[in-house]
Amino acid sequence: MKKLILSRLTVAILFIASPLGHLNAQPPIIQTKFTADPAPMVHKGMVYLYTTHDEDYAPEGMAGFRMKEWLLYTSTDMVNWTDHGTIADLYNFKWADPAVSGWGGFENGAWAPQCIERNGKFYLYCPVQGRGIGVLVADNPFGPFTDPLGKPLIGAEYDSIDPSVLIDDDGQAYLYWGNPNLWYVKLNEDMISCAGEITKDKLIRKIENQKDPYHFQEGPWAYKKNGHYYMAYASTCCPEGIGYAMGPSSVGPWEFKGYIMKPNRKSSGNHPGIIDYKGKSYVFGFNYRLNFMITDKHHERRSICVAELEYNPDGTIKELPWWDDGVAVEPVGTLNPYKRTEAETMAWSQGLKTAKDDKSGMYVTSIHNRDFLQVKAVDFGKGAKTFEVRAATITKGKIEIRLDDLDGTLLGVCDISNTGGWNTWKTFVTDVEKVGGVHDLYLVFRGGDGEMFNMDYWRFK
């Protein structure tokens, strides 16, 4: 409770001193959880962002990782992200279950994954720290994911963390991974077995006993664009930047080209994920900003960020400033408020958490007085007349519906009354001032002390 109070007080002071729009040019895109190791995938017009999860209770210090599951977020506009919760955890791998294996690293085992689609199946490559790299398979990107092998795909003896996958133009798939070495192997078309020998790349890693902060450390991200092969990576620790190399083939030889983002003392680690989406290129990574909004102590509680990426005519990449000094991405789409919008879809929030139950799936919880959520680029068209929300509570509260700022135009206030239980859901409706055009929407929560209600979804009519 003390930590929760500190978090709310600290964030409240920050927002009073600096309105949301000026908080920072490049804020973390997820605020309800600590997330890291972004693995974006584009599929049928949507971005699927697979992440690791740093637990809130991670202890102080740079070695205090607490990671037990993999999460999924989606977006169609690059600014509003929907939380789909846990899509896999260490229990998906029976060979990692401590009850079966006796393995003692379960509190810190679910490290950086990557998901890729092939022939209608989705393959989630997951490093189980200290045990190897496993692979899970599903029929759709939301899962459920299952382990087809019942054993690691790559054994623990090969620096087996941070997998990245590339399917080349000829259909040959490659799996890359490693720290401090870069390893790779060809995959068969089934994507769950290796074709040939595991190989250590001898050119890309740092030179022993030399201070060369731009070389490969970990977190490879392999991709091809406009005829060029790229290997992005977290550069020599610590702190880690995002470096990259280019080569003539999927296995190099790799030539160092520079930084995508230089190291910064504000962050110890890094992990790139790079995609093209709706005519633009993006790089994902992480910082520790949300952690330091709560405390001045270092905890391994990271937060994913994203920035637009630009290429030079020769294929090299323009260097970006550190996340805190960069430019926020612009929406590449709008949100339709007349369709059901899950409460866990947001661009920014204060004080909120997400949870899941069998009746409603994901929902927003931990709603207190003065908390809020923001949704960007909401297209009201010719105008809305009413606002409805599905909520559950044993107490009461209010939702202020505002435009473009925390104290922006007030469209209306929706009263939430006792529904008889925290998972007993009821729909509440209120009239709103007529509004049209594209705006940022703020749902600002008001009420007494303590938790007020849970929220499932909202929409305008």
Language model feature labels by segment:
Residues 1-26:
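Bacterial Sec-dependent N-terminal signal peptides
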Residues 23-413, 417-461:
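Carbohydrate-active catalytic/glycan-binding domains of CAZyme proteins
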